[in-house]
Amino acid sequence: MKGSLVSDVFLTGEELANKVRKLLSGRDVRAAVAFIGIDYASALEEMLGKGGKVVCDVSMGATNARALDAIRKKYPNSIRKVHGMHAKVIVGASESLVSSANLSRNALGLTEQPGRLVEAGLLLNKESEGFRRLEDWFDSLFLSGEP
């Protein structure tokens, strides 16, 4: 487990929200999130336009289905639905984040206003065993999801 704990970072509040936004703006990002709010639809669309993939749950009604359907028409092979998805994981090129935060205004706020919920997350670097396990987990989950 070389390096698995050396540079892991615990994030909360605005620091967490900023890291989520930064990760989503990268290339080939993979995100598994329970819910995607309407305020984060454009960030999701931008992420998918850069080769990203997303897994989410639409069955509980918290993800904006109309926004997701519009994005799916543009990127049909980049979105998968998994019933019961409750994890919040973002895998970037050099960092991965496991957190409590959905992609929503309540959780992360917007750039000019903070979120209303108390959220926390753990950032893992690419050298950690956890990072590699998250990559494998996401890829397996994506393959098993419904288009």
List each model region and its residues:
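Primarily the HKD phosphodiesterase
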Residues: V6-Y75
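Signature of lipid phosphatidyltransferase scaffolds
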Residues: D8-V9, G13, V98-P147
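Short beta-alpha junction loops
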Residues: D57-A62, M85, E127-E129
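General small-molecule cofactor/ligand-binding pocket signal
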Residues: N77-V82
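Short beta-strand scaffold segments in enzyme catalytic cores
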Residues: H86-V91, A120-L122
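Short hydrophobic-aromatic micro-motifs
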Residues: I90-G92, S96-S99
